[in-house]
Design a protein with these regions (language model features):
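Short, internal strand/loop/helix patches
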Residues: 97, 108-143, 149
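Bacterial N-terminal signal peptides
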Residues: 7-17
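Short loop/turn microsegments at loop-to-beta-strand junctions
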Residues: 35, 61-63, 141-143
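Thiol-/selenol-based redox modules, centered on thioredoxin-like
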Residues: 140-177
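Conserved redox-active cysteine motifs that mediate thiol-disulfide chemistry
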Residues: 66-87
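Short pre-active-site segment immediately N-terminal to redox-active cysteine/selenocysteine motifs
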Residues: 60-62, 67-71, 103
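A short beta-strand-turn-helix
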Residues: 38-61
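N-proximal helix/coil linker or "cap" segments that precede and/or mark the start of modular domains
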Residues: 16-41, 55
């Protein structure tokens, strides 16, 4: 029985780790033009807007991070980290956008309950996540991209650890300006 369990678990572990490594290969490179997107989402500060696209952020730095699921421990930690530093990002001409497979209702609840003060976008089929090498069905992988005001990938973080990630992104942003 033990061998049966091990023989079943090992392929799943290898598949998960390989996909995580492979996402690095499929993610846009620094200097590439950022893939365009048009996604529905939620921002509690902009009640009249429900759809966002890359061109909405033209002329500003964009921190675009992909994450697996609203309300999970790591995702909440990462989201709150960006929320706490939102003013610092704004002072540096940067917007923050989080993308996951969750729907708008989930994003609205997540923003309300966890005081998230920036835009969360819904990518339920992973089409945009996949363009950024960030899709491990049925979830987005935890990757972050810093997009320059002219729409190019300026920096990328693959398979992010959420603790202090927002501070790390802010420090890189400050060096880029």
């Amino acid at each position: 029985m033990r061998y049966l369990v091990v023989s079943i678990l090992i392929p799943f572990i290898l598949l998960f780790n390989c996909k995580s490594v492979l996402s690095f290969d499929f993610a846009p490179e620094v200097g590439d033009i950022a893939p365009n997107f048009q996604l529905e989402g939620f921002n509690k500060n902009i009640k009249t807007k429900t759809t966002w696209e890359l061109s909405d952020f033209q002329g500003k730095w964009l921190v675009m991070y992909f994450y697996p699921k609203d309300f999970t421990a790591g995702c909440t930690l990462e989201a709150k980290g960006f929320s706490e530093l939102k003013k610092d990002f704004s002072k540096n001409n940067a917007e923050i956008v989080g993308i996951s497979a969750d729907n708008q209702d989930s994003h609205e609840s997540f923003c309300s309950e966890k005081s998230i003060n920036y835009t969360l976008l819904s990518d339920p089929d992973g089409i945009i996540s996949d363009k950024y090498g960030s899709w491990i069905p049925p979830f987005s992988d935890r990757n972050t991209f810093l997009i320059s005001p002219d729409g190019k990938i300026s920096y990328r973080w693959i398979s992010v650890v959420p603790i202090n990630h927002a501070k790390e992104v802010l420090n890189v942003l400050k060096k880029k300006i």
